[in-house]
A protein has these predicted regions:
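Conserved acidic catalytic loop of the alpha/beta-hydrolase fold
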Residues: 1-4
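Gly/Ala-rich beta-loop-alpha elbow adjacent to hydrolase catalytic centers
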Residues: 7-16
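Flexible "cap/lid" loop of the alpha/beta hydrolase fold
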Residues: 21-57
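Conserved alpha/beta-hydrolase catalytic His-Asp/Glu region
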Residues: 58-108
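Short beta-strand/loop motif that positions the catalytic acidic residue
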Residues: 110, 116-118
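Conserved loop-alpha-helix segment in the C-terminal half of the alpha/beta-hydrolase fold
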Residues: 118-148
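Catalytic histidine-centered segment of alpha/beta-hydrolase-like enzymes
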Residues: 148-159
């Protein structure tokens, strides 16, 4: 298959990186937004995967709470997806998924135009990812967003993300 543009934030970026690693689909422009590309220290894997599982569980069971906390269409979409997906895999699927995310290392990557985005507030985590990615693909274009934290650009400025993606399409 062939795609013009693919964007993945965090876990979505990890999934996109795995697609690029396998080189099964040609993607003209790829954006990895704060994607975890390196394994975490072993001691951190279990607490983080249970933390993420709790997040997904609360998205499924306490949807109204999250809609109240985050007044954003983006969160409505995420919450709706959790409501659809969680009943089919439950906690085990979430735990298995995050175990894979947190323990695998990107070994290779293919693509003609790869971008890595992250915010300055997550730089301590993102810099090693960028270093690893640029060692595999030196032409990677890295963009750092001042004052932004993990996922904040998409949540707070979805129109800016859309505009950047549209510009890429016509480059």
């Amino acid at each position: 298959g062939h795609h013009d543009i693919a964007y993945g934030l965090s876990l979505g970026g990890k999934i996109l990186s795995r697609i690029l690693e396998r080189n099964e689909i040609v993607i003209k422009h790829s954006i990895l937004d704060a994607a975890p590309l390196l394994p975490l220290p072993r001691w951190l894997v279990t607490p983080l995967k249970y933390y993420q599982c709790a997040n997904v569980w609360t998205c499924y069971h306490w949807t109204g709470f999250w809609r109240w906390v985050f007044h954003s269409h983006y969160f409505d979409v995420i919450l709706d997806e959790c409501k659809k997906a969680y009943p089919f895999g439950g906690s085990k699927a979430v735990l298995d998924g995050y175990t894979s995310v947190y323990t695998t290392k990107l070994e290779s990557i293919s693509g003609s135009d790869i971008h890595y985005w992250y915010g300055t507030k997550e730089a301590f985590v993102a810099r090693p990812q960028v270093s690893h990615l640029t060692s595999l693909h030196p032409e990677t274009k890295v963009e750092v967003f001042k004052g932004m934290n993990h996922g904040q650009l998409l949540i707070d400025k979805p129109e800016e993300v859309a505009q950047r993606i549209m510009r890429m399409q016509y480059e």
